[in-house]
């Protein structure tokens, strides 16, 4: 096995170099869209911080989810964040898997261009809704008596532009309808549902999305309406965007690449059958000529 790994290591680096060259050419073509997507993430964060200046703490609203789900408490608020970070990190790793995997169905740059469009459309609607109506935040740091529930007017423009990072991001209030975490989660899960290849991962991803939604409500980070609105809004937005954008073409397989690890017996037989069928087709074409 060590001998095999030593022999395949140069192939791995050639694969990474080849993929990096391809992705660099795509990035040179699509860099404006990628940059716009990144800039909009900052704009979304700026808006979420800006609405905190308008937030006024008050009694927690009556909520069916709060009635059904017992509060986890402040000491267990990290549960939902742990699930979210797992989903977020796993999705990022998956989008970069073409650099090392011999199975290449997507291009990293193209998949992120599409993801940024999904996010920008959903977050634009979110900005409109949380500026239209500010609800009293249910989170512990947004309740009456908390020093973080209200923030004084900014002293200068720079204070607003810097979003009081990182506290302004972690301890925000007022940006409720609808849940930002749920936007990211559903965009990532639905994107993998469409372009991923592992069925069990798709099922697991949807399960984790449901669990995260439940944990967010149980942590009192959002009202139930914030989660419900996110679920149908993001799905409708992605459906609409997909109907307007051209379908992202799958990568052509071309010549069968050499795998990084030995193929199983079943895979080897399937590969042999494919090679044999390809050879027959080539011979038939030659005979016709």
Swiss-Prot record:
<keyword id="KW-0443">Lipid metabolism</keyword>
<feature type="compositionally biased region" description="Polar residues">
    <location>
        <begin position="280"/>
        <end position="289"/>
    </location>
</feature>
<keyword id="KW-0746">Sphingolipid metabolism</keyword>
<dbReference type="GO" id="GO:0030148">
    <property type="term" value="P:sphingolipid biosynthetic process"/>
</dbReference>
<dbReference type="GO" id="GO:0016020">
    <property type="term" value="C:membrane"/>
</dbReference>
<feature type="active site">
    <location>
        <position position="222"/>
    </location>
</feature>
<feature type="region of interest" description="Disordered">
    <location>
        <begin position="249"/>
        <end position="289"/>
    </location>
</feature>
<feature type="transmembrane region" description="Helical">
    <location>
        <begin position="169"/>
        <end position="189"/>
    </location>
</feature>
<keyword id="KW-0808">Transferase</keyword>
<comment type="similarity">
    <text>Belongs to the sphingomyelin synthase family.</text>
</comment>
<feature type="compositionally biased region" description="Basic and acidic residues">
    <location>
        <begin position="266"/>
        <end position="279"/>
    </location>
</feature>
<keyword id="KW-1133">Transmembrane helix</keyword>
<feature type="transmembrane region" description="Helical">
    <location>
        <begin position="77"/>
        <end position="97"/>
    </location>
</feature>
<keyword id="KW-0444">Lipid biosynthesis</keyword>
<dbReference type="GO" id="GO:0016780">
    <property type="term" value="F:phosphotransferase activity, for other substituted phosphate groups"/>
</dbReference>
<dbReference type="InterPro" id="IPR025749">
    <property type="entry name" value="Sphingomyelin_synth-like_dom"/>
</dbReference>
<dbReference type="Pfam" id="PF14360">
    <property type="entry name" value="PAP2_C"/>
</dbReference>
<protein>
    <recommendedName>
        <fullName>Phosphatidylinositol:ceramide inositolphosphotransferase 3</fullName>
        <ecNumber>2.7.8.-</ecNumber>
    </recommendedName>
</protein>
<feature type="active site">
    <location>
        <position position="181"/>
    </location>
</feature>
<dbReference type="InterPro" id="IPR045221">
    <property type="entry name" value="Sphingomyelin_synth-like"/>
</dbReference>
<keyword id="KW-0812">Transmembrane</keyword>
<comment type="function">
    <text>Catalyzes the transfer of the phosphorylinositol group from phosphatidylinositol (PI) to phytoceramide, an essential step in sphingolipid biosynthesis.</text>
</comment>
<feature type="transmembrane region" description="Helical">
    <location>
        <begin position="33"/>
        <end position="53"/>
    </location>
</feature>
<dbReference type="GO" id="GO:0045140">
    <property type="term" value="F:inositol phosphoceramide synthase activity"/>
</dbReference>
<keyword id="KW-0472">Membrane</keyword>
<feature type="active site">
    <location>
        <position position="226"/>
    </location>
</feature>
<feature type="transmembrane region" description="Helical">
    <location>
        <begin position="199"/>
        <end position="219"/>
    </location>
</feature>
<feature type="transmembrane region" description="Helical">
    <location>
        <begin position="115"/>
        <end position="135"/>
    </location>
</feature>
<feature type="transmembrane region" description="Helical">
    <location>
        <begin position="223"/>
        <end position="243"/>
    </location>
</feature>
């Amino acid at each position: 096995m060590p001998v095999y790994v030593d022999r395949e290591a140069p192939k791995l680096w050639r694969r990474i170099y080849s993929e990096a060259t391809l992705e660099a050419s795509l990035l040179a073509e699509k860099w404006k869209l990628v940059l716009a997507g990144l800039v909009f993430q900052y704009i979304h964060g700026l808006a979420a911080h800006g609405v905190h200046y308008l937030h006024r703490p008050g009694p927690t609203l009556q909520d069916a989810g709060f009635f059904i789900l017992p509060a986890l408490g402040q000491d267990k608020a990290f549960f939902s964040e742990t699930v979210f970070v797992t989903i977020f990190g796993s999705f990022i790793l998956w989008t970069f898997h073409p650099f090392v995997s011999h199975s290449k169905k997507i291009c990293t740059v193209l998949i992120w261009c599409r993801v940024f469009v999904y996010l920008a459309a959903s977050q634009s609607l979110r900005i409109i809704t949380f500026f239209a109506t500010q609800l009293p935040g249910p989170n512990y740091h947004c309740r009456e008596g908390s020093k973080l529930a209200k923030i004084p007017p900014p002293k200068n423009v720079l204070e607003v532009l810097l979003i009081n990072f990182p506290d302004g991001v972690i301890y925000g209030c007022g940006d409720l309808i609808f849940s930002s975490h749920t936007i990211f989660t559903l965009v990532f899960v639905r994107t993998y549902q469409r372009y991923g290849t592992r069925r069990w991962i798709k099922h697991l991803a949807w399960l984790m999305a449901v669990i995260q939604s439940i944990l967010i409500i149980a942590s009192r980070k959002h009202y139930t309406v914030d989660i419900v609105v996110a679920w149908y809004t993001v799905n409708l937005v992605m459906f609409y965007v997909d109907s307007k954008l051209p379908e992202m073409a799958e990568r052509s397989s071309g010549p069968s690449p050499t795998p990084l690890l030995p193929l199983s017996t079943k895979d080897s037989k399937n590969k042999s059958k494919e090679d044999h069928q390809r050879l027959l087709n080539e011979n038939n074409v030659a005979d016709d000529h």
